[in-house]
């Protein structure tokens, strides 16, 4: 008999709106014993069936919904259906944008909570972020092998969020060939190296595809500063947009080395590039003291806020770094500024940029707004899925 989780009276409203999470505070009782990650049924206080979900006893999110259809079984066929539904959309995007690298599964928004899958050529990179996802590992891999027999599968479940689920960090080859140290992918006419084994996240920031295209369009004739550059995808975009110069800044020499290789891969002019290993905050202050000026600054920092208690300090960090950037821009210069934290509301981020401009002593115009690329969809019932936000700001 399936274990049943009974909600407290009145706590079913979010599920009726098809939100995929059940928090521990919404639960009245659990009927039966369930293993971590096991599939359970969710019922309201009157015993009405609501959903079928994965049980996560170590997490504040006590259950994550697999399905709202009572007759749907969570088996290999279920995962095959979800994969095929997701692939239909990615096929269209891949053809439109000339892609052989994209996010295949975006967790809750593709009906597979806690599961992230990126495809880079014929390599599938898997992140299992929840107890339910981990419990279904073998079944999911079987579904992937059925749908993508040509692909190797590599595990990058080495992310700290797994600790909140009581899970160990895992990484390594699941099946097929070991990925090369650097694998090139195509994006809007660019070739970009992906480091599947050692790179950030799954190896590359696919979510910034549209923002890179915007940077390319703004770059013509401009002197560009690319902050938190990682492997230089924004620098490649700027050079393809015929920038005057692009300076890429990161604290890691290894990613700057890959950035240089990316520029060489695209046969672009290395004489128009500079790579600086430094702390961005310190370098911006140094540039300000030296009177350096730029026409386009790309500000794409790592996540400043991991939990709500860090939000206030993150706001200060975002304001300070964007203030410095605005001070380095010539009149008419463009700032492309981003936040990748789901805990940072878009309206608050916009206010931070406005406050940064005020502190910098300049007026700015908001001329364009960004979000994650379309292979990272946001299902209507789960607004938390919209984590990446950005603005193009013109300095007056």
Swiss-Prot record:
Class of this enzyme: transferase
Family: Belongs to the methyltransferase superfamily. RlmI family.
Annotated protein name in UniProt: Ribosomal RNA large subunit methyltransferase I
Annotated InterPro entries: PUA, PUA-like_sf, PUA_sf, RLMI, RlmI-like_PUA, SAM-dep_methyl-trfase, SAM-dependent_MTases_sf
Lineage of the species this protein comes from: Bacteria, Pseudomonadati, Pseudomonadota, Gammaproteobacteria, Enterobacterales
CDD domains found in the cross-reference section: AdoMet_MTases, PUA_RlmI, RlmI_M_like
Protein source organism: Yersinia pestis
GO molecular function: RNA binding; rRNA (cytosine) methyltransferase activity
PUA domain residues: 2-81
Subcellular localization: Cytoplasm
EC number: 2.1.1.191
GO cellular component: cytoplasm
Classification via SUPFAM superfamilies: PUA domain-like, S-adenosyl-L-methionine-dependent methyltransferases
Keyword line: Cytoplasm, Methyltransferase, RNA-binding, rRNA processing, S-adenosyl-L-methionine, Transferase
Pfam families given in the database record: Methyltrans_SAM (PF10672), PUA_3 (PF17785)
Physiological role: Specifically methylates the cytosine at position 1962 (m5C1962) of 23S rRNA.
Catalytic activity of the protein: cytidine(1962) in 23S rRNA + S-adenosyl-L-methionine = 5-methylcytidine(1962) in 23S rRNA + S-adenosyl-L-homocysteine + H(+)
Coiled-coil annotated residue ranges, if any: none
């Amino acid at each position: 008999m399936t274990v049943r989780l009974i909600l407290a009276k009145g706590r079913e409203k979010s599920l009726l709106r098809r939100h995929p999470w059940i928090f521990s505070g919404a639960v009245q009782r659990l009927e039966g014993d369930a293993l971590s990650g096991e599939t359970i049924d969710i019922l309201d206080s009157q015993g009405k069936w609501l959903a079928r979900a994965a049980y996560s006893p170590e997490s504040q999110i006590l259950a994550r919904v697999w399905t709202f259809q009572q007759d749907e079984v969570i088996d290999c066929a279920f995962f095959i259906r979800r994969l095929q539904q997701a692939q239909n959309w990615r096929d269209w995007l891949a053809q439109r944008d000339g892609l052989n690298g994209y996010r295949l599964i975006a967790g809750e928004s593709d009906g597979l909570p806690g599961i992230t899958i990126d495809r880079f050529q014929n390599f599938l990179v898997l992140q299992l972020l929840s107890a339910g996802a981990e419990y279904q590992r073998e079944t999911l891999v079987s579904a992937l092998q059925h749908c993508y027999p040509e692909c190797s599968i590599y595990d990058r479940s080495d992310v700290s969020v797994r600790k909140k689920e009581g899970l160990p960090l895992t990484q390594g080859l699941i099946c097929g060939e070991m990925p090369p140290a650097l694998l090139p992918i195509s994006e809007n006419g660019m070739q970009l190296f992906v480091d599947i084994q050692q790179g950030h996240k799954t190896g590359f920031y696919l979510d910034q595809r549209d923002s890179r295209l915007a940077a390319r369009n703004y770059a013509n004739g401009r002197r560009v500063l690319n902050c938190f550059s990682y492997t230089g995808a924004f620098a490649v975009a700027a050079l393809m947009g015929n920038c005057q110069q692009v300076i890429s800044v990161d604290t890691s020499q290894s990613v700057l080395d890959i950035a240089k290789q990316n520029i060489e891969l695209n046969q672009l002019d290395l004489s128009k590039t500079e790579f600086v290993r430094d702390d961005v905050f310190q370098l911006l202050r140094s540039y300000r003291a030296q009177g350096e000026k730029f026409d386009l600054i790309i500000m794409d920092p790592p996540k400043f806020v991991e939990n709500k208690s860090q939000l206030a300090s993150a706001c200060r960090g975002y304001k300070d770094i964007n203030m410095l950037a605005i001070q380095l821009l010539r009149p008419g210069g463009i700032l492309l500024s981003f936040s990748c934290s789901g805990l940072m509301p878009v309206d608050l981020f916009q206010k931070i940029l406005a406050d940064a401009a005020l502190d910098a002593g300049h007026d700015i115009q908001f001329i364009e707004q960004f979000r994650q690329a379309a292979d990272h969809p946001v299902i209507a019932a789960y607004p938390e899925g919209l984590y990446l936000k950005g603005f193009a700001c013109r300095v007056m």
